[in-house]
């Protein structure tokens, strides 16, 4: 992708505040080590603290079906061999675009754009992304998020201000060290579960209202398995939602959020862990309730030298056969939506 729209001379994105759950993992020698998380601040970091590597002022590919500004955030803890954004992985590189420039662009294009996609790098590596998503929403735009799921706590804070998530599942949980250089599989799949849960809750108005009982336990209404004759209605008044059930009357104040859409995508290439265990990975995704899936064939353009050299030795005929097998398996897996993005 081309990163465009540089700031005026002298502009700076300022310092970077990483989230509290940065992976504590040992990278390979060839990988850049992410910054250690700073001490938690009493005040949530501002969007003005974001280190932004660049932006694409009009994108039709980063959020399916939407016209969006793609904002590329600096830094990523992973070392995926096929990464096409290698130049923006180093978290120590200062930002090139101030957040104020993003907001100025949005102000000029109100009514023309659907939203903003926060991508990277790994967008959730910087704690200011939560404020950024909130501010974009306040300006009347939708918020899309690209993530590999390495920061589940940061994701949990950002999801209430997000309308669409594109989450990369790199491999089965125990293959992440081989696939990305870091053993972040447990966190990545935890993040996937969080996206699926949030999407299910926000698809059902009843689930959008939650209340704690006297013991502090959360009572959740399940709109898919509603007992016959259950006495429950859901009323909305601004940000207040009242749930009446079996004589109980609980009111919950909650952000006025709409549905959360998502896409799970897996990138494959010859010899990749995801390629070797693709059918098993599909089964796990379906078992967890994934509805929307995209299979992506890795491209070599703009990737690290080592990956391009490796690609020269691929058996193209064998790869074409294996790729056809994976596309066929995914198309028959039962996803509500499936897309194959071939190089």
Regions found by a protein language model. Give the residues of each.
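Short glycine-enriched, charge-decorated loop/helix-capping segments at active-site entrances
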Residues: 86-93, 178-184, 307-316
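Auxiliary Fe-S-binding modules of radical SAM enzymes
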Residues: 2-65, 202-205, 212-215, 223-224, ...
């Amino acid at each position: 992708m081309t990163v465009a729209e540089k700031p005026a001379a002298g502009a700076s994105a300022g310092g970077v505040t990483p989230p509290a759950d940065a992976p504590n993992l040992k990278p390979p020698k060839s990988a850049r080590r992410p910054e250690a998380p700073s001490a938690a601040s009493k005040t949530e970091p501002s969007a003005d603290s974001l280190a932004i590597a660049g932006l694409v002022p009009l994108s039709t590919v980063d959020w399916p079906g939407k016209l969006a500004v793609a904002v590329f955030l600096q830094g990523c803890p992973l070392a995926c061999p096929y990464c096409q954004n290698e130049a923006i992985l180093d978290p120590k590189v200062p930002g090139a675009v101030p957040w104020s420039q993003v907001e100025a662009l949005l102000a000029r294009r109100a009514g023309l754009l659907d939203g903003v996609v926060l991508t990277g790098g790994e967008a959730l590596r910087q704690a200011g992304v939560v404020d950024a998503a909130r501010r974009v929403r306040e300006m009347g735009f939708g918020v899309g998020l690209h993530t590999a799921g390495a920061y589940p706590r940061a994701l949990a804070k950002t999801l209430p201000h997000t309308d669409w998530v594109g989450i990369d599942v790199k491999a089965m949980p125990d293959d992440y060290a081989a696939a990305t250089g870091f053993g972040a599989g447990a966190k990545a799949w935890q993040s996937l579960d969080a996206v699926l849960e949030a999407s299910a809750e926000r698809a059902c108005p009843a689930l959008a209202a939650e209340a704690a009982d006297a013991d502090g336990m959360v009572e959740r209404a399940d709109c898919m398995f509603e007992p016959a004759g259950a006495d429950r209605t859901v009323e909305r008044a601004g940000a207040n939602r009242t749930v009446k059930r079996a004589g109980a009357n609980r009111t919950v104040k909650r952000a006025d959020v709409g549905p959360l859409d998502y896409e799970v995508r897996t990138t494959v290439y010859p010899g990749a862990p995801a390629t070797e265990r693709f059918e098993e990975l599909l089964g796990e995704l379906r078992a967890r309730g994934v509805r929307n899936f995209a299979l992506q064939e890795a491209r070599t353009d703009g990737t690290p030298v080592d990956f391009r050299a490796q690609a020269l030795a691929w058996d193209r005929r064998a790869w074409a056969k294996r790729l056809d097998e994976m596309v066929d398996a995914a198309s028959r897996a039962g996803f509500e939506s499936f897309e194959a993005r071939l190089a």
